Design a protein with these regions (language model features):
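Acidic, Ser/Thr-rich intrinsically disordered and amphipathic helical segments
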Residues: 1, 16, 27, 32, ...
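A short, amphipathic alpha-helix used for macromolecular contacts
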Residues: 1-35, 63-77
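Basic, flexible linker segments flanking DNA-binding modules
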Residues: 36-68, 100-101
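RNase H-like polynucleotidyl transferase catalytic core
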Residues: 46-49, 111-112, 171-175, 191-210
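Extended, low-complexity cationic-aromatic segments
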Residues: 58-157, 263-264
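C-terminal anion-handling pockets and recognition modules
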Residues: 75-79, 85, 208-270
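Acidic/histidine-rich, metal-coordinating catalytic segments
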Residues: 82-84, 165-179, 205-206
């Protein structure tokens, strides 16, 4: 009963199982249940947060993966990947450990200053290709379609030139309404920029997510003091990401597609 319940409902707690078994006439402790599950190779883990996928999203993801499964690596080399991300000032730093004496927890050297709501954050737009990272831009205020097009004008085209994107390069962005707005589509068409058709709710198909994680780890180690410092450090660390890392992400892109297919369209480890 224990294994059957957990297989069908992985979020079941040990207390739930104790109560279910008690109702069925069997008395066991939470410790016994925990030991039983561990013997079966199961352990309690934090549930991963993934985008909410509706049936249409799953179908679109499978369609994308199957249509591009046999694309050559050269096809993906042509792509300039982009995305936005939020970076918290005291996000990762808030769990930093320190060596201190007893009763010295609140010494300034042993604590991390925070303010209400986490100390603030900055929004960034960035892009990369197999040849390396492109420009990184801080988004100030609420981004609308006009601001997005301005960001593209000031950052996308210069990035494409710097990364030596030749004829036939392809631009990737997700299906945010600002990205798919009529004015944005017309702007891209006017600039003769080909856009990769993209399935919604699919950050795991965008390799830039790996670079965002890398950036956040690097930034946290430098312990920025304020938002301006955070922006400066983000740009410095973004520029330090090696082209080899970018090339490797693109070279292994097919693995993302096979994972989506193997997972029947649902979210993957990427």
């Amino acid at each position: 009963m224990i294994m059957r319940t957990v297989r069908n409902q992985p979020r079941t707690t040990r207390e739930d199982l104790v109560n279910d078994l008690k109702a069925a006439g069997t008395i066991v402790t939470k410790k016994t249940i925990g030991n039983t599950l561990r013997r079966e190779g199961l352990k309690s883990c934090s549930a991963r947060k993934v985008p909410l996928l509706k049936k249409t999203h799953i179908q679109a993801r499978l369609k994308f993966a199957n249509e591009h499964l046999n694309d050559s690596e050269e096809n993906w080399v042509k792509v300039l990947w982009s995305d936005e991300t939020k970076i918290e000032l005291f996000g990762i730093n808030s769990t930093r450990r320190v060596w201190r004496r007893r009763n010295a927890a609140y010494d300034p050297k042993n604590s991390i200053p925070t303010i209400k709501h986490g100390g603030g954050n900055i929004m960034l737009w960035g892009c990369f290709s197999a040849k390396g990272t492109g420009q990184l831009h801080r988004i100030k205020g609420t981004m609308d379609g006009a601001m997005y097009r301005q960001i593209l004008g000031e950052n996308l085209l210069p990035s494409a030139r710097a990364l030596k994107k030749g004829r036939g390069w392809v631009f990737q962005h997700d299906n945010d309404p600002k990205h798919t707005a009529k004015a944005t589509k017309e702007w891209l068409k006017k600039k003769h920029i080909k856009v990769l058709e993209w399935p919604s709710q699919s950050p795991d198909l965008n390799p830039i997510e790996n670079l965002w994680r890398e950036l956040k780890v690097r930034v946290a180690k430098r312990q920025p003091r304020n938002l301006n410092d955070l922006e400066k450090i983000c740009k410095e660390e973004w520029d330090k990401i090696l082209p080899e890392m970018c090339a490797n992400l693109v070279a292994n892109y097919k693995k993302r597609l096979t994972s989506v297919i193997a997972n029947k369209g649902f979210a993957t480890k990427y």
